[in-house]
Design a protein with these regions (language model features):
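Start-transfer (signal-anchor) and selected internal transmembrane alpha helices
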Residues: 1-43, 196-272, 391, 508-520, ...
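Interfacial juxtamembrane loops and adjacent helix segments
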Residues: 267, 271, 283-334, 399, ...
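Juxtamembrane segments of multi-pass membrane glycosylation machinery
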Residues: 313, 319-362, 381-382, 589-598
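Transmembrane-helix motifs of polytopic, lipid-linked glycan transferases
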Residues: 354-384, 427
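Specific aromatic-rich, kink-prone transmembrane helix
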Residues: 419-450, 468, 663-667
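Membrane-interface alpha helices of multi-pass inner-membrane proteins
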Residues: 426, 449-475, 482-486
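Perimembrane helix-loop-helix junctions
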Residues: 480-522
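Hydrophobic, aromatic-rich transmembrane alpha-helices
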Residues: 581, 588-629
Length: 753
C-alpha cells in the first residue's frame, strides 16, 4: 500500500501540464511586454524627444511666399508653385513642426461649393480642397524630405525637420490648387498616442509566429478532416474573415452611393455596370438603359479611338468607358451570371441596386471558404498524415497566391467575374475531389462504379460540373478547369473503357457518370449562349471587342513582340523597393511595342515565393502523392496555357493573375509539404516530423527545423507584400487617392521615427 508521501507526489502528466501552462504564461507576458515597449517607447519616440520643446511661436500667422494667397475661409491657393511656401522660425528645441489645417466643416463646405460649380458648368473640372497635401520643410537653407499629409489624419500634420533657423514649408502643388492649410508651428511637442490598430497588427504578427514556429504544438497535431474538433476549429477560424468582411458588406450596403464620374469633354466612368445589367434583366431586355448620343449613333465606326476623341471634342456625351456599344445600344461584356445570382435578387427585394463593392466582398468571402476547403482536401489527398501547422501554412500561402489580397482591395465591377469564377471553380473542384467517396450513399443509385475503380458520387459529379460550367457566365477562361476532370477520374475512365470493351458494363450503366457531368453543363451553358446570341448574334461572342477602351478592340491584338515580356512579367516581375513608406513601389515593365499594361508590384513567383515549389513538382518524382501527381501536373499545365492566353489577349494586367495563380498554388502543395515534413511516413505523423519530441524541436533534424522557419517567414513575406501593395501610390485605385486618411494614418506610424 503506498505511503502518504507517495500519494502526494504529482503524476508526470500533471507536471508536464503545469510546465506547459507556465511556459505559455511566460510567453504571453513576454509578448505583451514586447508590444507595450514597441508602442510606448519606439512608436512614441517623438513624444519623448520633444518633452523639452519650448512651444514658442513668433507670430499668429506665418509669412506667406508670393506664390500663396489666403482665401476668405482661411485656406490657401497656389498662384505660383515656385514661390509657394510658409515661413517661420525654429529655435532647435524640437525636431518637429506641426502644420495646421482648416476644420472639416470648412473643407466640406468648400468641396460642396466646388461640386455645385462643376455641375452648373456641364461637369467642368474645378479645383477642390486637397485631401492629400505634398509638402517639404527646409530648415536654415537645408533641403528637407518631401512628404504628404491629410487634414483628417492628425498625426500626419507633424513633420520631422531638425535644426534651428528660418524654416520654409514648401507647398508642392500645381497652380490653382486649394490647400486646406492655415499655418505651421515650430518648436512643438508631439503628443503621446497609443494606436490600437498598430497594437493589433503587432499582436497578429506575434500570434502567427507563435502558432507556426517549429516548436508549436500544431506541428504535433495530425490534420484530420473527419475530426469534429478540427472542423469546429476551422469554422471558428473562418468566422474571423466572415466577421471582418461582413462588417465591410454592411458598411457598403449602408453608405455606398452611385459611382458615376464625368468631366466635360471626357468619357463617363460608371462603375454600376452590374446594377445596369440587373435593371435590364428585370425589364426583360438584353441592352442597358443608358442614353446614346445622336452623334455616336450616326458614326459608322465608333470603335476608332480618333473618332471617339473627335466625338468628345464635339460635345458628344455620355460615352461610357469600358462599356460595349453595339448596334445602337450599350451592353456589358462582363459575365452575366453574377447579376443573375446577386444583383437581380437584391434589386427585386430591396428596390435598388446592390453596391458592386458589397457583391465583391460576398464573392471573395465565399472564395476564401471554398478555396480553403479545396486546398485542405488536396493536402489530405497528397499527404494524409501531415500536421495542422503545415496545412495552415499551405492554405494561407495558397490564398495569397490566388490574389485574395488584390480582390479584397479592388472592389469594382472588373473583379466581379474573377471572384465569382474563383468561388464556383473552388466549389466545383472540391466536390469532384470528394466524388470518389466510400461513404454510404443516401440512395444506392447515387453511386456509380466501373470495374475495380473507386465508386463515384453522381450528385457530387453533377454539382461540380454545374459549378465549373457556370464559369461560362462569369470568367470564361475558368471553364478550362473542366479539363482537370480527365486526370482526376482517369482510373474510372480507363475502367469504363475496359468494361465496355469486355462488355462487363452495360451501355446505359456506362452513360450514367458522363451524363451526370454533361447534362448540368448543358443546362447552364445553353441559356448563357442564348444570351450572347440575342445580344451579339453569336453564342460565343461576349461583346468584349465592342468595348470603348484604350484602343479599337475590334482590331487590337497584343503585339507578338510583347509576348515573351508579358509572360516573364506575369511570372518573374521583380519587386521594387524604396527608402520611404510604403517601401514598395510599382515595378517598371518596359515593352518592345506599345500594349496594355496595368501597374504591378511583382509577379506570382516574386510576391509569393513559395509558389516556386510548383516548378519543382516535375522533379519530385519519388515523392508519394497518392495518385494526385497527374492532376497536379495538369493544374500546372493549365496554368501555363492561361499565362500564354492572358499575355496574348489581355496584355499585362494584375487582375489576370487570378486566372492562373490558384492553379500554381495547388501545384505547389506537394513541394511545400515535402519541405516541412520530408517524405511521407508510412504509418504516423512522427515520421513526417522526424520523430518530434515533446517540445517539437529537440528531435527534429536541423534541416527540417530550418525549412519550417523558412516556410513560415516566406508566408509572412507574402502577407506583408500583399498588405504593403495596398499602399503603393502608382497602382490602379490607389489608396492615397481613394482613402487618403487611412493611407496617411498608417504612414504616420513610421515617418516621425
Amino acid at each position: 500500500m503506498p505511503s502518504n508521501h507517495e500519494r502526494r507526489l504529482p503524476s508526470r502528466p500533471d507536471t508536464r501540464h503545469r510546465l506547459r501552462l507556465v511556459r505559455l504564461l511566460i510567453a504571453l507576458l513576454a509578448a505583451i511586454a514586447a508590444i507595450a515597449a514597441m508602442e510606448c517607447i519606439v512608436f512614441n519616440l517623438p513624444f519623448w524627444r520633444t518633452l523639452g520643446a519650448s512651444t514658442d511661436t513668433n507670430a499668429v500667422h506665418n509669412t506667406l511666399g508670393s506664390g500663396l494667397t489666403r482665401r476668405n475661409d482661411g485656406m490657401l491657393t497656389v498662384t505660383d508653385p515656385t514661390k509657394a511656401y510658409l515661413e517661420l522660425t525654429a529655435d532647435g528645441t524640437s525636431d518637429y513642426l506641426r502644420i495646421d489645417t482648416e476644420s472639416s466643416k470648412v473643407i466640406d463646405k468648400a468641396r460642396e461649393q466646388a461640386e455645385a460649380e462643376s455641375k452648373a458648368n456641364d461637369d467642368k473640372e474645378v479645383f477642390k480642397p486637397l485631401a492629400t497635401i505634398h509638402v517639404r520643410a527646409d530648415v536654415d537653407g537645408i533641403t528637407g524630405k518631401a512628404q504628404s499629409m491629410n487634414p483628417d489624419a492628425i498625426r500626419s500634420h507633424y513633420v520631422k525637420a531638425p535644426g534651428a533657423g528660418i524654416v520654409r514649408i514648401w507647398i508642392q502643388e500645381e497652380r490653382g490648387a486649394i490647400v486646406p492649410v492655415t499655418d505651421a508651428r515650430a518648436n512643438v511637442r508631439v503628443p503621446f498616442v497609443i494606436n490600437w490598430m498598430r497594437v493589433l497588427a503587432m499582436a497578429l504578427v506575434l500570434l502567427m509566429i507563435a502558432v507556426w514556429r517549429p516548436g508549436s504544438c500544431l506541428w504535433r497535431i495530425t490534420l484530420d478532416p473527419s475530426s469534429t474538433r478540427q472542423r469546429l476549429a476551422f469554422v471558428g477560424l473562418l468566422a474571423i474573415p466572415t466577421l471582418l468582411i461582413g462588417v465591410s458588406i454592411i458598411h457598403e450596403l449602408w453608405y455606398t452611393s452611385s459611382l458615376v464620374f464625368h468631366v466635360s469633354g471626357d468619357y463617363t466612368y460608371d462603375f454600376d455596370q452590374y446594377g445596369h445589367v440587373a435593371d435590364a434583366l428585370v425589364a426583360g431586355r438584353p441592352w442597358l438603359d443608358l442614353p446614346v448620343p445622336e452623334q455616336l449613333a450616326a458614326t459608322e465606326h465608333p470603335y476608332d479611338v480618333a473618332t471617339r476623341a473627335q466625338l468628345l471634342a464635339n460635345g458628344a456625351s455620355p460615352l461610357y468607358w469600358d462599356y460595349a456599344y453595339y448596334d445602337g445600344h450599350w451592353y456589358s461584356y462582363f459575365g452575366v451570371l453574377p447579376a443573375v445570382l446577386l444583383f437581380v435578387p437584391y434589386r427585386l427585394l430591396a428596390g435598388h441596386n446592390l453596391p458592386t463593392s458589397a457583391a465583391e466582398y460576398i464573392l471573395v468571402l465565399l472564395f476564401i471558404i471554398f478555396f480553403s476547403l479545396l486546398v485542405l482536401r488536396v493536402i489530405h489527398r497528397v499527404m494524409p498524415k501531415t500536421s495542422v501547422a503545415a496545412a495552415s501554412l499551405v492554405v494561407v500561402s495558397s490564398l495569397v497566391s490566388a490574389q485574395m489580397g488584390y480582390l479584397l482591395y479592388r472592389t469594382n465591377f472588373y473583379q466581379i467575374p474573377f471572384a465569382a469564377s474563383l468561388t464556383l471553380t473552388s466549389l466545383g473542384l472540391w466536390l469532384w475531389l470528394g466524388a470518389d467517396t466510400s461513404r454510404r450513399p443516401l440512395r444506392p443509385s447515387d453511386r456509380w462504379q466501373a470495374g475495380d475503380a473507386k465508386p463515384l458520387s453522381l450528385p457530387r459529379l453533377a454539382l461540380g460540373a454545374l459549378c465549373i460550367a457556370a464559369n461560362f457566365g462569369c470568367r470564361p477562361t475558368f471553364t478550362l478547369a473542366a479539363l482537370l476532370a480527365f486526370p482526376l477520374f482517369w482510373p474510372q475512365i480507363r475502367a469504363l473503357g475496359t468494361g465496355l470493351r469486355t462488355r462487363r458494363i452495360k451501355p446505359l450503366q456506362a452513360l450514367r457518370a458522363p451524363l451526370a457531368v454533361i447534362i448540368p453543363a448543358i443546362l447552364v451553358v445553353t441559356p448563357l449562349m442564348a444570351w450572347n446570341m440575342v445580344r451579339f448574334d453569336s453564342p460565343f461572342n461576349f461583346g468584349n471587342a465592342y468595348q470603348f477602351s484604350i484602343s479599337d478592340m475590334t482590331r487590337y491584338t497584343t503585339p507578338s513582340a510583347d509576348m515573351p515580356a508579358n509572360i516573364w512579367y506575369y511570372l518573374f516581375l521583380p519587386l521594387r523597393f524604396m527608402d520611404r513608406f510604403p517601401w514598395l513601389a510599382g515595378s517598371p515593365a518596359p515593352m518592345p511595342q506599345w500594349g496594355y499594361y496595368e501597374v504591378m508590384v511583382g509577379a506570382i513567383f516574386t510576391a509569393t515565393p513559395l509558389t516556386l515549389m510548383a516548378l519543382a513538382l516535375p522533379l519530385l518524382r519519388r515523392l508519394e502523392t497518392h495518385g494526385m501527381r497527374p492532376w497536379l501536373m495538369s493544374c500546372l499545365a493549365v496554368a501555363a496555357v492561361l499565362v500564354v492566353f492572358d499575355s496574348r489577349v489581355g496584355g499585362l494586367g494584375w487582375r489576370y493573375s487570378a486566372d492562373f495563380g490558384w492553379l500554381i498554388s495547388l501545384a505547389s502543395i506537394p513541394g511545400l509539404l515535402w519541405l516541412v515534413n520530408g517524405r511521407e511516413p508510412s504509418r504516423s505523423l512522427a515520421g513526417a516530423n522526424d520523430a518530434a519530441s515533446g517540445d517539437g524541436i529537440a528531435r527534429v533534424t536541423p534541416w527540417r527545423w530550418l525549412m519550417r522557419w523558412v516556410v513560415m517567414l516566406a508566408v509572412l513575406w507574402a502577407l506583408g507584400i500583399a498588405i504593403l501593395s495596398c499602399f503603393v501610390q502608382s497602382r490602379s485605385d490607389s489608396m492615397i487617392a481613394n482613402n487618403p486618411t487611412l493611407w496617411h494614418q498608417v504612414q504616420s506610424w513610421f515617418t516621425l521615427l
